Amino acid sequence: MNSKLEQLKTMTTVVADTGDIDAIRHWRPEDATTNPSLLLKAAASEAYRPMLEKAVAHAAQHGGSDAEQLTVATDMLAVLAGKEILGLIPGVVSTEVDARLSFDTSATLERARRLVDFYDRQGVDTNRVLIKIASTWEGIRAAEQLEKEGIRCNLTLLFSFVQAVACAQAGVHLISPFVGRILDWHLASSGRDSYPAEEDPGVFSVSRIYNYYKANGFNTVVMGASFRNTGEIEMLAGCDRLTISPALLQDLKDDQGTLARKLNPETASSPDKPGQINEKQFRWESNEDAMATEKLADGIRRFAADQIELEHRVRQLAQAA
């Protein structure tokens, strides 16, 4: 009997949710995703030291104010990490735009284009890069324009159905609906200790989005993210992609049980009918969803805080040089 991880790979593209080079080398996933939190953690390892030094040197050559050099250095670090990861996987890597720009369409466009330019200058095929952007109204508008320019996007911090509808409407390449953080909110608000996997609110959210997309012919890829346990993963077997932490990958590898497919494009059906979402509707429906409003804001704050900490680490290295 194959492990549940091997069974999952026959129906879903497995993505490693880590910036740890050694973990990616070990797991050999199809794709990989990174974010400021993962980069901050990875940057503490010696494997990242040469990349940090190269990023700082590049920023110094770029010139500009200290603040500008910091953003250049952290962008270049993300690109160098992405380049290293792409040498270990056959698919794509996702690189995130600074979360502090989540409510600024033009600034998001500028930074996204710079990331792609940095990849291009490193000799990387930019078709293997997805630009991660928070699923705010402004972020979705930026992604819509980037997709028209041939820059494929991964819309992250997605917690609500209206965000998913708006992303599909904008022609976004891929979305990352979060599972575990939705569960976290419902556990805290309900006072419950747990939910069975088949009743998990995060699983329900991703399943609803997946079935809506497939039943209505949307091409946007659904990549479930932010898992708290393997039960959530098993309930989403068959989803286009699932991005999974190394610890949960190990749990799936160690499990020799049978894994049943739960999501299938051939049998997808949805009571939700496609419609056009305008800004007023998006903001109202987002406001009415307390969980999505709170988790989106919290996610942006967390990524922004880790971005600031990453810049602090880069500044220390630059001052020591």
UniProtKB/Swiss-Prot annotation:
Pathways per UniProt: Carbohydrate degradation; pentose phosphate pathway; D-glyceraldehyde 3-phosphate and beta-D-fructose 6-phosphate from D-ribose 5-phosphate and D-xylulose 5-phosphate (non-oxidative stage): step 2/3
GO biological process, one term: pentose-phosphate shunt
HAMAP family assigned: Transaldolase_1
PROSITE patterns cross-referenced by the UniProt entry: TRANSALDOLASE_1, TRANSALDOLASE_2
Active site: 132 (schiff-base intermediate with substrate)
EC number, UniProt record: 2.2.1.2
GO function term, MF aspect, one: transaldolase activity
Main localization of the protein described in the UniProt heading: cytoplasm
Keyword entries, A-Z: Cytoplasm, Pentose shunt, Schiff base, Transferase
UniProt signal peptide: none
Family note: Belongs to the transaldolase family. Type 1 subfamily.
Subcellular location: Cytoplasm
Broad EC category: transferase
NCBIfam families: PRK12346.1, talAB
Function, as annotated: Transaldolase is important for the balance of metabolites in the pentose-phosphate pathway.
CDD domains reported for this sequence: Transaldolase_TalAB
Record InterPro entries: Aldolase_TIM, TAL/FSA, Transaldolase_1, Transaldolase_AS
Quaternary structure (record): Homodimer.
Protein name as catalogued: Transaldolase
Catalytic activity: D-sedoheptulose 7-phosphate + D-glyceraldehyde 3-phosphate = D-erythrose 4-phosphate + beta-D-fructose 6-phosphate
Origin species: Marinobacter nauticus (strain ATCC 700491 / DSM 11845 / VT8)
Pfam families, per the entry: TAL_FSA (PF00923)
Gene3D superfamilies referenced in this protein's UniProt entry, alphabetically: Aldolase class I (3.20.20.70)
One of the record's GO cellular component terms: cytosol
